Structure formats: C-alpha cells, structure tokens
Amino acid sequence: MNTQMVAGFDGAQLAVHSVGEGRPVLLLHGLFSSAEMNWIGFGHAQVLADAGFRAIMPDLRAHGQSAAPHDPEAYPPEALARDAEALAEALALEPGAFDLVGFSLGA
C-alpha cells in the first residue's frame, strides 16, 4: 500500500492510497468514512490489485487522513467533483484511461 498527499482543487492536502499495477480504478468512499473503511479494510482494493488493476483510493476532504479545512469556503457544492478532477490531473489519469467507482457520498 502506498500513500501520498495530493493537492485538492484549492490546495487542501488529500491523502491518496494505492495498491496494485495495471488499469487505474479510482474508488471514492462514502460519507463519514475513508478509504480504509470502505475499500482497504474489507479487502476490495486487494481484490482489484490481484485482478491486475491499480486501486486508487483518496480520503475525501474532511475524511480519513485528508485535510479538514475550517473555512466554509473550502466546501462549495462542487468541492468533491473538483477534488476528483484535481486528483485525476495530479495522477495523470487521462479521460477514458481509468474507471471510476463511487459509494454513497462518493457516487
């Protein structure tokens, strides 16, 4: 398991966990959760890695190991979508070259 910090749309630091090699699958967790709770702890990420995929699991802002800014301006309605775009860009995930999976808040 690899963990790195990546800047969200406004520079907030987001923890991004990854495991495996192959076609990237970006996994977005649910509300009041984290990558550990939704994807790592239950083994979903490892199943994907074992099947030849690269599971990429950010902790969404204010969740898990990611920053939780106190400024309300850090949470516009489109914050999660903008963070996902920033992550894809930072990780060089080209449109059509990765799969996106969301659960609850991440959907």
Q: Where is each model-derived feature located?
A:
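A short loop-to-beta-strand scaffold at the N-terminal edge of the catalytic core in hydrolase folds
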Residues: 9-19
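Short beta-strand element of the alpha/beta-hydrolase
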Residues: 23-30
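Structural signature of beta-strand start/N-cap positions in the alpha/beta core
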Residues: 24, 54, 96-99
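The serine-hydrolase catalytic nucleophile loop
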Residues: 32-45
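Conserved alpha/beta-hydrolase
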Residues: 48-67
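Catalytic nucleophile-loop/oxyanion-hole region of alpha/beta-hydrolase
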Residues: 67-81
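Conserved acidic catalytic loop of the alpha/beta-hydrolase fold
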Residues: 78-96
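Gly/Ala-rich beta-loop-alpha elbow adjacent to hydrolase catalytic centers
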Residues: 102-106
